[in-house]
Amino acid sequence: MSNRAVPQGYLANLQFRIRSDNLPLLSTVQPSRGHKRGGRAVNYAEFDNELLEDFSNFPTFDIDSDSNDEEQSSASAGNDDPQANANGGEAAGVNGQGSGDGGSANTGAGRHGKSQLTAEMEKNYKTGVPDLNEQKDSLNVLRYQKIRESFQHGKIAVPYRLYVPPELSTGQQEAILIPITLNVEHGNNTISDAFVWNVNDTSISVEDFVTTYCNDLGLYGNVSLHSQIVSSINEQIQELENVASLVIPDLEVVVNLTCTIQGKFFEDYFQWNLSDKSLSPEKFALIIVADLGLAREFAPGIAHSLHEYLLHVKKEWAEGSLHQDTVPNEAAFGYLAGVRLNIDDLGAKWAPKVEYLTQEEIQKREIEKERNMRRLKRESDRMGGGARRGRRRLDDLELTMKM
């Protein structure tokens, strides 16, 4: 047995982990069973029991079109090599679940024409993977099932060479961060992701980022999905770029922050100064995660939710419809108050909390939060729209007098 080991960062199991239930970044939607026009109807009453038993031994394929069935049957009938048949079955299906659209980690070139992965890329990804039994395992870590599965489902990591010119790296402007939310459905796959995009970072374009993003998810060369994600990111950037670049004077708002990850519902209630640049949402999220002992997945989730809330406050402030709850300042001579003592509940409202909730309870909390925000917006419109209503009534009165 050889003592060679896999180099550091040679294999990646990202595509395997994102399809698990704990990381629902790329989920597979089960297609609904329905009659398709043009589908071939099979009358099983014509077969005897023995024929049905023989028929059940053959592998099943998609019956989206007659040509695909004939091509699959002719390929399997003309090739008696079991290894070749196994490779053909892998290229035709996605983990034994039928043909996919390039959204699986084991998707081959595909005889259905749905995957755009070339034969050369497929060969490079299938060759060069070290054997599991030839690894030097001095710590005996391969005996654990999770580690063995991670090694077996690993694929060769593709290094991305990103050249940043010196003038771009040294002359960067102040970061304008925009929270991006992706909820894209393509075929049988649904991408649900959230990240932050810096508008002033010109070292990489949206198109190049989406290309790398699709390659990491195993969606190689999917042109329609690539354009769909690019358009979604560009729309959100155009919508929020002007709001994110606003410079707001000294303004303190009360933030009711919520974040849900892996069935854990995080909620916090605190005061935030929009003009203070010493504390960013990313630093705040890291402090919260460290203090509460949360998983690392909460750090980008909390930062993204805080960015969304602050942009919502900026937009209302620019439109003149900001209605925020303020903390009464009980200090004398207009100075800022220090630590407030609440004898009733000891400030439990201002403490972060984490709850284990079901999916129905999480959706109920989110609906209640959106309902409260709409109620506050209606109240602010009612308070700020009195002059407009009075003018409209005066115009109606003048029109009535003229008539």
Curated annotation (Swiss-Prot):
Subcellular location: Nucleus
Bias type Gly residues, positions: 95-105
Pfam families on file: SNF5 (PF04855)
GO biological process, one term: transcription elongation by RNA polymerase II
Region (Disordered): 58-115
Record keywords, A-Z: Cell cycle, Chromatin regulator, Nucleus, Transcription, Transcription regulation
GO molecular function: nucleosome binding
Residue stretches in coiled coil: none
InterPro entries: Sfh1/SNF5, SNF5
Gene Ontology cellular component annotations, sorted alphabetically: nuclear chromosome; RSC-type complex
Domain of life: Eukaryota
Chief location: nucleus
Assigned protein family: Belongs to the SNF5 family.
Physiological role: Part of the chromatin structure-remodeling complex (RSC) which is involved in transcription regulation and nucleosome positioning. RSC is responsible for the transfer of a histone octamer from a nucleosome core particle to naked DNA. The reaction requires ATP and involves an activated RSC-nucleosome intermediate. Remodeling reaction also involves DNA translocation, DNA twist and conformational change.
Name of the protein in its database record: Chromatin structure-remodeling complex subunit SFH1
Gene, per the UniProt record: SFH1
